[in-house]
């Protein structure tokens, strides 16, 4: 219905015509959106889904039929719990329901083919895997998953708590099946080419994919991601500077000294402002300027807003890859122009350069 209203009822029979006043159309669309805007509305939709659509009730069918982003569900509950509330499936009780329900919203934006393929392979057989024997890249992908669900890195894959958490996931069959369905859905939705970025070690982060701060840091072997509060992180063991860029900064979230003006100049150049305490003559400033000679790399992760406007949680970052110093002006703070190794795709460019100020 929403699509018909927006498109002008193009599907009505030949010779028929429907026109809504702008105010009436807005009123109807607002009411349709409101029906998905709470748990009760979703329960009602689920209860009548098969009758309304003629389709089997599955997560994919529900999302496709109503043109929903998975986060529209996961901001409230799991799809399985909503189905149980609608008496569409039997009620269930599983050990990880609360933990997984919170994690679903973060997993609903995963868009790396490599990571999703790994998870689809490993999650159905968690109780038959020697995690400590996995190849390095797969260990890192497992860490990314673990920190997403449990909020901290797994320091030791043989640790009793870590194994207990993973085995509890294996025992949560209803929600594990939902997780696998979500991952398959996300894989089908990927509409860009992702590829590895050469960092000198087997890193599972892929170009132009979406990652939370915690996911990307554990993928870079930094196991205390929650300690990172600033927009930069130097990883000396890897010789990597990680930049976390938020393009649209709200006054309530940032102080006057952290309202940095960051944006893409074009598909290859990115304007970035250092921290206000960074002088060009400082070790950090010199490392930025001479990173090639120093043998270090700069990685750029960009998001549009701090908060995910759909869930209210923290928005994830798009990985723009490695960047190289071009020039700078100023000191305390430094205005640096970086050249990206790979150009920004058009769909991301609309977001990264729309905030340029004159």
Task: Give residue ranges: language-model regions.
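Long, largely alpha-helical accessory region at the distal end of helicase-like NTP-driven motors
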Residues: 2-121
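Acidic, glycine-rich low-complexity segments with interspersed aromatic residues
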Residues: 76, 82-105, 109, 113, ...
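Charge-dense, extended regions
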Residues: 133-242, 246-250
């Amino acid at each position: 219905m929403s699509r018909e209203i927006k498109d002008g009822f193009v599907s009505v029979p030949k010779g028929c015509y429907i026109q809504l006043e702008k105010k009436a159309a807005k009123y109807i669309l607002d009411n349709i959106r409101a029906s998905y805007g709470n748990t009760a509305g979703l329960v009602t939709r689920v209860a009548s889904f098969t009758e309304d659509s003629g389709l089997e009730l599955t997560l994919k069918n529900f999302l496709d039929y109503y043109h929903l982003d998975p986060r529209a569900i996961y901001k409230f509950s799991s799809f399985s719990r909503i189905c149980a509330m609608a008496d569409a499936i039997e009620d269930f009780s599983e050990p990880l329901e609360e933990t997984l329900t919170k994690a679903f919203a973060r997993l609903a934006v995963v868009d790396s083919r490599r990571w999703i393929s790994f998870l689809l392979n490993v999650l159905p057989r968690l109780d038959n895997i020697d995690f400590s024997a996995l190849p390095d890249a797969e260990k890192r992908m497992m860490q990314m998953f673990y920190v997403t669900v449990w909020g901290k890195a797994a320091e030791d894959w043989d640790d009793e708590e870590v194994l207990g958490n993973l085995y509890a996931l294996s025992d949560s069959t209803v929600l594990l099946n939902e997780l696998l369905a979500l991952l398959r859905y996300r894989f089908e939705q990927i509409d860009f080419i992702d590829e590895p970025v050469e960092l000198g070690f087997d890193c599972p982060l892929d170009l132009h994919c979406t990652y939370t701060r915690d996911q990307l840091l554990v993928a870079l072997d930094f196991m205390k991601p929650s300690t990172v509060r600033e927009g930069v992180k130097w990883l000396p063991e890897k010789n990597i500077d990680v930049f976390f860029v938020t393009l649209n900064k709200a006054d309530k979230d940032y102080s006057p000294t952290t309202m940095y003006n960051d944006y893409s100049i074009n598909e290859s150049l990115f304007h970035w402002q250092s921290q206000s305490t960074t002088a060009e003559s400082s070790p950090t400033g010199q490392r930025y300027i001479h990173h090639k000679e120093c043998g270090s790399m700069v990685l750029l992760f960009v998001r549009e807003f701090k908060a995910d406007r759909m869930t209210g949680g923290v928005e994830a970052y798009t990985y723009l890859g490695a960047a190289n110093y071009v020039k700078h002006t100023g000191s305390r703070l430094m205005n640096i122009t970086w050249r990206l190794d790979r150009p920004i795709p058009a769909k991301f460019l609309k977001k990264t350069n729309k905030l340029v100020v004159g």
